[in-house]
C-alpha cells in the first residue's frame, strides 16, 4: 500500500502514498491506524523487494516479529500524501530492526520501531 518508492540506500528507504477514499483502510474521511501500520509494513516490503530485484535474487517473505513504541498523533485525511521513511537500525542474520517515521508535509504523524524476520 504505497504509491511510489522515492528513495533507497542501504540505510534509508522512503515511499509516498496518497490517501484515497476507496482505500480499504479509509473510514469517515481518514486513513485508520491499521492503515498507517500497513503502509509502514509495505514500505519495509518495498525495501526488501527493491534489494532483491536489484541483485537479481528472489524476493523473500518478511514477517513482522515486533512493533514497539508505536505512536500516532493523528490519522491522515483522504487526499493527504504520506511520506514514510524507514531507517535501518541494525541487521543481524535474517533479522532487521528499523525505525519508521510517517509524515504529512513536515508534520510527523506516526513513529514506531519494527523487528522483521526474513524467511528463506
For the regions a language model picked out, list residue spans one by one.
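Hydrophobic residues on conserved beta-strands that form the core of alpha/beta folds
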Residues: 2-3, 64-67, 97, 111
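Catalytic strand-loop segment that frames the active site of acyl-thioester-processing enzymes
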Residues: 1-32
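Compact, glycine-rich, soluble single-domain proteins
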Residues: 28-47, 61-65
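Hydrophobic beta-strand-centered segment that forms part of the acyl-chain substrate-binding groove
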Residues: 46-83
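Short amphipathic alpha-helical segments enriched in hydrophobics
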Residues: 9, 23, 44-51
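HotDog/MaoC-like acyl-thioester-processing domains
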Residues: 14, 77-83, 88-120
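A residue-level detector for short acidic-glycine micro-motifs
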Residues: 4-7, 69, 74, 88-90, ...
